[in-house]
UniProtKB/Swiss-Prot annotation:
Name recorded for this polypeptide: Orotate phosphoribosyltransferase
UniProt binding sites for orotate: T132, R160
EC annotation from Swiss-Prot or TrEMBL: 2.4.2.10
Keyword Disulfide bond set for record: no
Cofactor(s) required for function per UniProt: Mg(2+)
Annotated catalysed reactions: orotidine 5'-phosphate + diphosphate = orotate + 5-phospho-alpha-D-ribose 1-diphosphate
Keywords for the protein's UniProt record, in alphabetical order: Glycosyltransferase, Magnesium, Pyrimidine biosynthesis, Transferase
Gene: pyrE
Length: 187
């Protein structure tokens, strides 16, 4: 399937499985009359495969060592990308960033690294399922930077177009999205 056909098919899956209208309160606290819940798409076999493929293609030229997903929404995505990268003989390891460190055990904010493994000096991409203001991803970036990593890109599946682009620019972070909310609202 061509990239444009994959993108169109994934948009159809998102529209069917993950997009809805109706009043909802977002993680940012804002009210909205539409929402995206990408978990049903990320956990659908075809949706997961297409998300992984398009995301992998979007970051392939970034010379990435690791891809980190925000808890909980982007964890399935990070895993799918890691698996696909292995199949393409260009392995990119995955980790996830907790909203807050666990209060027991190792008390880590960044999870998924093997004992003795470190992000220090590594090039990382942070992935998010849906981005509104960018606040959650910026907090995740801070946690990953504390591990010594270089953040080369923040990549979201859907940008709600409510200030994230400006927030990432102000933070000096490159930001891209696979889709814009307007692509779903205007259909």
């Amino acid at each position: 399937m061509s990239k444009s056909a994959s993108r169109a098919r994934l948009a159809d899956i998102i529209r069917t499985r993950s997009f809805g209208r109706g009043e909802i309160t977002l993680a940012s606290g804002r009210k909205s009359d539409f929402y995206f819940n990408l978990k049903p798409t990320m956990l659908d076999p075809e949706g997961a495969a297409l998300l992984a493929e398009l995301t992998y293609e979007a970051l392939r030229d970034e010379q990435v060592d690791y891809i980190g997903g925000l808890e909980m929404g982007a964890v399935p995505l990070a895993g799918a990308i890691a698996q696909l990268s292995w199949l393409k003989n260009h392995p990119i390891a995955a980790f996830f960033v907790r909203k807050k460190p666990k209060e027991h055990g190792a008390r880590l904010a960044v999870e998924g690294l093997a004992k003795g493994e470190s992000l220090a000096g590594k090039r990382c991409v942070i992935v998010e399922d849906v981005t509104t203001t960018g606040g959650s991803a910026i907090k995740a970036v801070e946690a990953v930077r504390e591990s010594g990593a270089e953040i080369v890109l923040v990549l979201t599946m859907v940008d709600r177009e409510e200030g994230a682009t400006e927030a990432f620019a102000a933070a000096g972070l490159p930001f891209r999205s696979l889709y814009k909310a307007s692509e779903f609202l205007n259909r």
